[in-house]
Amino acid sequence: MNQTLAAATLAAALALGNGPAWAADSVQDPIERGRYLVRIGGCNDCHTAGYLETAGRSPEADWLTGSAVGFQGPWGTTYPANLRIALANYSEAQWIARARSEMRPPMPWFNLAAMTDDDLKAMYRYVRSLGARGTPAPDYAAPGQAVNTPYFVFVPQNLPPKTAGR
C-alpha cells in the first residue's frame, strides 16, 4: 500500500513539475509564443498604460505602447518604453543584443537577459506583428532633474538598519 501511494505521489509530482514547461513548450508558433511570454513575463505591467488598473483587460491593440508614468529613484526618472516603436527600428539581432544589456531601473533586465534566444526571437516577432503604434515615452531625466509627468517614487521606506556582517 505504501509503495503504491509513494509511486502515485511521485508520478503526480513529476506531472505537476513538468506542467508549466509543457504548457509553455506547447506554443510552437513564434508569434503565439511571444504573446505568451509577454503576458506571463509581466511586460504589459509597465509597458502598457492602464494595464494594471484594468486587471490585465487592456485591449491587445494597446499593448506595449509605453507609458508616461515614470519611476523615480536614485538613478533619476525612467519611463517604460514604447516597445512597438522601439522594436520597429531594431533588427532581430539588435533586439537580442539589447535584451542582453543592462538597463536602468526598475526594468528587470536580468530576467530578460536570462531568456533563450528563441524566446527573445518569439517576443520580437510578436511585438513586430502588432505594428508600430503610439508615441515614444518621455525621455529619461537625470537625478535631481524636475519632471512634469506623473511618477512613482521607487525608494524603499522604513528599512531596518543594516546589521554588521550581513
Regions found by a protein language model. Name each.
Residues 45:
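Short, cysteine/histidine-rich loop/knuckle motifs that typically chelate Zn2+
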Residues 35-41:
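Local sequence-structure signature of Cys/Sec-based thiol-disulfide redox active-site neighborhoods
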Residues 27-29, 40, 48-78, 109-166:
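Flexible coil segments in periplasmic/lumen-exposed cytochrome c-class electron-transfer proteins
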Residues 6-14:
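Hydrophobic helical h-region of N-terminal Sec-dependent signal peptides
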Residues 1-5:
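Positively charged n-region of N-terminal signal peptides that target proteins for export
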Residues 92-96, 100, 117, 121-124:
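An amphipathic alpha-helix signature
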Residues 19-25:
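Sec/Tat signal peptide C-region and signal peptidase I cleavage site
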Residues 84-88, 97-98, 109-111:
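A structural feature that tracks compact, well-ordered secondary-structure segments
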